[in-house]
Amino acid sequence: MTIIFDFGGVLVQLDKQRCIDAFAKLGFDLAPFIGTYAQSGILSKIERGEAGIPEFCEEVRRVSGLPLKDNDICEAWAAFLTEVPRERIDMLRRIRKHHRLCVLSNTNEIHWALAENKYFVKPGERVEDLFSHVFLSYKMGLEKPEKEMFEKVIETLQEPADRLLFLDDSEVNCEAARKTGMRSLIAPADGSWMNYFEADGRLKAEYEA
């Protein structure tokens, strides 16, 4: 069984209001563009890979009418992510001993850089040491819940769809995965998804069937 995790809200904790407040301090109202499960406007474009960080920063300057620095804009956007609790990392390491682990996420270059350089690694480690495959919206040009994104995952992993278990905090995304034949479970943002697994990291029998 391959276990596929969402990133934001499942592994990393999110604080939308903290991000909105960070942009407000810069004089920019982010609220109309930011969502919990999906983004709009320029935020959607950076999550689909249709715009890079320079374009993102330029759009914020254009909309705000303020001469904001790229670094300040990027730091404010990074404020959306807070931390990956240690117990979740420890559980992932135990799960990996029994199951192939992957990530499937609507994310962007700034947020994933935090994953690669801060959240998932110890000195000398790489994200690839924990996850065998990483599927990111901004690299794929697709976003959940688009059917094509899940089909690409199935094609890449070369495993029967019913042997792929997707954990996401959005029921819309979970249902989209099920429509392609994948299995899916809601993964609450409070980390209680860890209860799907035994203490040693094995998926509990009732979820294997």
Range-by-range predicted roles:
Residues 1, 99-100, 162-163:
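Short coil/turn segments at beta-strand junctions that form active-site/ligand-binding loops
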Residues 1-86, 97, 108-114:
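N-terminal helical cap/lid subdomain that shapes the substrate entry/recognition surface
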Residues 4, 104, 166-167:
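Generic enzyme active-site microenvironment
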Residues 6-9, 49, 103, 134, ...:
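Generic structural signal for small/hydrophobic residues in well-ordered secondary structure
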Residues 20, 89-93, 103, 150, ...:
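Short amphipathic alpha-helical segments and helix-helix/interface helices
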Residues 93-97, 178:
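Anion (oxyanion) recognition and catalysis
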Residues 101-103, 184:
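Hydrophobic beta-strand scaffold residues
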Residues 108-109, 115-209:
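Asp-based, Mg2+/Mn2+-dependent phosphohydrolase catalytic module
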